[in-house]
Regions:
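Accessory carbohydrate-recognition regions in carbohydrate-active enzymes
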Residues: 22-154
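Bacterial Sec-dependent N-terminal signal peptides
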Residues: 1-24
């Protein structure tokens, strides 16, 4: 009798466990471009919770709208830096700036008031993809697709 009770309890618990819903992935509902225009001072880069870096494109260098490095209304990218803070309202980006290029480059700045570096590239938002942990864009000047990814720290 006791053995039957234990077996029935085990079967019942196993059956109840198998009826629990699986974990849902809500990342498809995330829009990383929210706050990248106006004065939201956010960026669309490849970010995951507790990640060590926040790689993202930098479209601006100076002034208030350059706080996060990315401003949605811009159409040129100066490079991709690896440290950003989202929504802070102060310049906190631009460390370890990388730019994929092809051919001979001119590395002189365009002038103090210019928002573009000499090696900047035009891009289109139609060729831009941002998802949690992933960012890609096609750089028109160099005909290069740049892809950024991030993972959580171990």
């Amino acid at each position: 009798m006791k053995l039957n009770f234990m077996l029935m309890s085990g079967v019942l618990l196993f059956g109840m466990y198998s009826c629990t819903p699986g974990a849902q992935d809500y990342s498809s509902y995330v829009n990383p471009f929210i706050g990248t225009g106006g004065h939201g001072h956010t960026y669309p880069g490849a970010v995951v919770p507790n990640g060590m870096i926040q790689p993202s494109p930098d479209t601006r260098i100076y002034q208030w709208d350059a706080c996060s490095g990315y401003y949605y209304a811009d159409s040129t990218i100066n490079g991709f830096s690896h440290t950003h803070l989202s929504g802070t309202g102060c310049g906190d980006y631009g460390d370890v700036l990388l730019m994929p290029t092809v051919g001979k480059q001119d590395y002189h700045a365009m002038g103090e008031e210019s928002q573009q570096m000499a090696y900047a590239s035009a891009f289109s938002h139609d060729n831009e993809v941002a998802q949690p942990g992933y960012y890609s864009v096609f750089l028109d000047r160099y005909q290069v697709k740049a892809e950024l990814t991030a993972t959580k720290r171990a």
